[in-house]
Amino acid sequence: MAIKKLGFVAVMTAGLLVLTGCASGPNNGVDQSKVDKAAQALLPAEYLDNGIDVASDIPYEPFEYLDENGDLTGVDVELINLIGQKLGTEIRINDAVFDTIIASLESGTNDIIISSMSDTVERQAKVDFVDYNIGGSQMIVAKGNPENITNPMSLCGKTVIVQNGTIQIDLIGTMSESCKVSGKKEITLTQLPDAPSMQNALRAGQGDAVMMDSFVAQGAAAKAGNGEYFDVVSDPEAPNGYDAGFVGIAILKKDTGLRDAIQAALQSLIDDGQYADLMAKWNMSANAVVSASVNGTKE
């Protein structure tokens, strides 16, 4: 069953997560002992006083999703909560559609994005990224891999499902061009709005594979139908996934003060070990960054 857009705001202060229809007062519940004063000093007053609105496309497990109790969780959720603690301000997570998620910053609906968003040169034209992870793409297929999909060339002539607005669109386009150059049939691309829709389409036989974030693919294969619905295609030529690169928190280019404060807060989490603990908790240590860089992806 596809999960509908949630329409809630998740308010997080000092490690407490509450699902609510509106925010309480600014800075309520902030534990000042966890604040990094140097990072906080970089934060423009409007965000210190009013909090930070965060756009996230939910669900996208293990980055942002609802657990069995209906609580919002995931590595992105926990990380932005820790950043809020370092800055001493309130974090409000707002559900957003991924292919219009940058537009939600431009309209003023949200201030930043944390949604397993790849740091790309194209996106850097509109936003800056504070990079916090290294990720790639992998495929899931129906259990037993009936189409014997093992690598990009085995996708030639097949239908691949991806999410709207993601880097996987260009990735499949490049793979399809390789098929054409090799004299094989091109790949048919199907775009859908979210991870549940993609999984449902694959189960319904509307595609031969889904290309998605590696960690999301692994989680889907392990959990969907208690592990009975999907397999992950593990390509030895791409052990970290296809097109592995930086994943970042996105901030509009004009909001340099907010960007610098978030970068400093993330660096503080790296320095005090909380970031390493978080990545270990979510089995992502191999994908951790060593420092909080801005726009790490280059031409």
Model-derived features with residue positions:
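Ligand-binding clefts/hinges and TM-proximal coupling segments of bilobed small-molecule sensing domains
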Residues: S24-K37, A41-L43, I167-E186, Y229, ...
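Extended ligand-binding regions for polar small-molecule ligands
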Residues: A23, V77-K86, M153, T159, ...
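A ligand-binding cleft/hinge motif common to bilobed small-molecule-binding domains
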Residues: M117-Q124, L171-S178, D208-D243
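Bilobed "Venus flytrap"/periplasmic-binding protein-like clamshell domains
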Residues: I58-E61, L72-Q85, Q138-D194, Q199, ...
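Periplasmic-binding protein-like
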Residues: I58, I134-V141, G225-A264, S285-E299
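Extracytoplasmic small-molecule ligand-binding "clamshell" domains
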Residues: G29-S116
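C-terminal motif of bacterial Sec signal peptides marking the signal peptidase cleavage site
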Residues: L16-G21
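Acidic, polar ligand-binding/catalytic clefts
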Residues: E90-S154
